[in-house]
């Protein structure tokens, strides 16, 4: 084990500039990471480290110790954040970081502020009898999905590092322990607001809201009603984010209010998955037994979560309770239109339409219904349509997406007729479509294969290969063609699980 002397040895790898630690003490609990026996660095995201202005050489040297929590860098102020949350509709007034410790904040080369957080770094006052640890499988999953989302262009937390601890964790079975280092524009959630509101702590809600405006939405300080403007801005970001999820077939799996950031980033990738065959009722999360967070339910859940945020802001939005409710409800009602606008705009791009027409929604819905009826793979179908947009010879490949090759003929006829009124050339259209229709996603079976190889054999080669492929999701990458393919029947992943 790293000695206490080494733990306190200064490391200048980070230039911390901490602000959350300056909030009132009730916002968090100061908490040092718990040391581990034999940390080993699985992966350091060197490009991200450089972008964050970190000392990459120091991280190569000390990364195992730093990212395991054995060596706390100079300037860190480790803490566990307090928050509450609705979990599958039921309210828990105290959750908090039960296995995550925020080391501090850094300012990147563009002047943006980011949190550096260790997940699996040991118990905290919020652990609720848990061990505060993480197993290697969920750590690798979060690393893979975080970086895949970034490459897909979807706002999400990032992966800075993954380390093994040299210690077991005890779940349904004994598994190798690991720690994941997450980077986020902040870790403030809807549940953070709920924590203070549930205690009748309006001053706490106000302090948190002012902090969020300063950190994430500084332009709103000039608004006539900054608190209402914040609610509108968060609603807009969530509508745009969830639309992007649907555009790539992403299913979060655990959209509790403590897993919804006010920054508009996707966070917490425990039971998430990407859809193979298109079915709007798709659920992967083993704990979502009633389909609350199914693929097609995600927009509505986003609105429900926003309503919970709005409830916490009512005392700030207007001194008159009825007026506050009316103003908040107007924002909540507008969310549906915001989402639909973002979703339809993205779907137009996916089928190659540059100009809006009234019949576009019906054209999109007809294709989706056909895909569902024919068991078509979501990602492959749209990628093959991109190819067809630029080369009529690709029609057999597109038709092969469906169980019955003739099934797509009527829709293709309508699509071509619609394209005849669109201004783009075929080449420009195909190129634009390939930028929004990925060839590669983190196929669930590929993620599981990479995790299994690491857990069972200590083999990280599949993990590394998957990261390489997913870093360029919109490129064809013929050398990695098998990674495009959906799972064979025996490879299908039927359920995913929470872990980190």
From Swiss-Prot:
Domain of life: Bacteria
Catalytic residues, chain numbering: 258 (proton acceptor)
Function: Nucleotidyltransferase involved in the post-translational modification of proteins. It can catalyze the addition of adenosine monophosphate (AMP) or uridine monophosphate (UMP) to a protein, resulting in modifications known as AMPylation and UMPylation.
Binding-site list for ATP: 96, 98-99, 119, 131-132, 182, 189, 268
Keyword flag Disulfide bond: no
Needed cofactors: Mg(2+); Mn(2+)
Keyword tags: ATP-binding, Magnesium, Manganese, Metal-binding, Nucleotide-binding, Nucleotidyltransferase, Transferase
Catalysis: reaction(s): L-seryl-[protein] + ATP = 3-O-(5'-adenylyl)-L-seryl-[protein] + diphosphate; L-threonyl-[protein] + ATP = 3-O-(5'-adenylyl)-L-threonyl-[protein] + diphosphate; L-tyrosyl-[protein] + ATP = O-(5'-adenylyl)-L-tyrosyl-[protein] + diphosphate; L-histidyl-[protein] + UTP = N(tele)-(5'-uridylyl)-L-histidyl-[protein] + diphosphate
Organism of derivation: Rhizobium etli (strain CIAT 652)
Family assignment from sequence similarity: Belongs to the SELO family.
The keyword Thylakoid belongs to this UniProt entry's keyword annotation: no
Listed name of the protein: Protein nucleotidyltransferase YdiU
Residues that coordinate or bind Mg(2+): 259, 268
């Amino acid at each position: 084990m790293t000695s206490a002397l080494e733990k306190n040895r200064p490391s200048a790898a980070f230039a911390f500039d901490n602000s959350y630690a300056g909030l009132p003490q009730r916002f968090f609990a100061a908490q040092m990471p718990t040391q581990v026996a034999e940390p080993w660095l699985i992966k350091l995201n060197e490009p991200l480290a450089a972008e964050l202005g970190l000392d990459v050489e120091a991280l190569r040297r000390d990364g195992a110790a730093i990212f395991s929590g054995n060596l706390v860098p100079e300037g860190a102020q480790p803490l566990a954040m307090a928050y509450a949350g609705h979990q599958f509709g039921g309210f828990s007034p105290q959750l908090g970081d039960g296995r995550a410790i925020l080391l501090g904040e850094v300012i990147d080369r563009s002047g943006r502020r980011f949190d550096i957080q260790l997940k699996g770094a040991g118990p905290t006052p919020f652990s609720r009898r848990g061990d505060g640890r993480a197993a290697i499988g969920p750590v690798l999953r979060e690393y893979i999905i975080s970086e895949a989302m970034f490459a897909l262009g979807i706002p999400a937390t990032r992966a800075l590092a993954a380390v093994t601890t040299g210690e077991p964790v005890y779940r349904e079975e004994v598994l190798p322990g690991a720690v994941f280092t997450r980077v986020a524009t902040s870790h403030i959630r809807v549940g953070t607001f709920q924590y203070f509101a549930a205690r009748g702590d309006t001053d706490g809600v106000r302090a948190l809201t002012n902090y969020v405006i300063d950190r994430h939405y500084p332009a709103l300080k000039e608004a006539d009603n900054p608190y209402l403007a914040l609610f509108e801005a968060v609603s807009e970001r969530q509508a745009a984010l969830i639309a992007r999820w649907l555009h790539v077939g992403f299913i979060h799996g655990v959209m509790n209010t403590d897993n919804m950031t006010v920054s508009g980033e996707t966070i917490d990738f425990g039971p998430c998955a990407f859809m193979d065959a298109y079915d709007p009722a798709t659920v992967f999360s083993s704990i979502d037994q009633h389909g609350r967070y199914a693929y097609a339910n995600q927009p509505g859940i986003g609105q429900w979560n926003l309503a919970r945020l709005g409830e916490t802001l009512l005392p700030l939005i207007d001194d008159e309770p009825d007026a506050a409710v009316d103003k908040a409800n107007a924002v909540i009602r507008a969310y549906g239109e915001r989402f639909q606008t973002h979703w339809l705009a993205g779907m137009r791009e996916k089928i190659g339409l540059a100009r809006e027409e009234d019949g576009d929604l019906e054209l999109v819905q007809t294709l989706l219904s056909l895909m569902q009826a024919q068991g078509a793979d979501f990602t492959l179908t749209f990628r093959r349509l991109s190819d067809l947009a630029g080369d009529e010879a690709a029609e057999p490949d597109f038709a092969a997406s469906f169980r019955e090759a003739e099934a797509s003929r009527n829709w293709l006829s309508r699509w071509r007729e619609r394209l005849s009124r669109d201004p783009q050339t075929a080449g420009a259209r195909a190129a634009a479509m390939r930028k929004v229709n990925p060839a590669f996603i983190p196929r669930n079976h590929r993620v599981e294969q990479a995790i299994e190889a690491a857990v069972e054999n200590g083999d990280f080669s599949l993990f590394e290969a998957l990261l390489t492929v997913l870093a360029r999701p919109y490129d064809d990458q013929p050398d990695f063609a098998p990674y495009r393919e959906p799972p064979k029947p025996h490879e299908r992943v039927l359920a995913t699980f929470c872990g980190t």
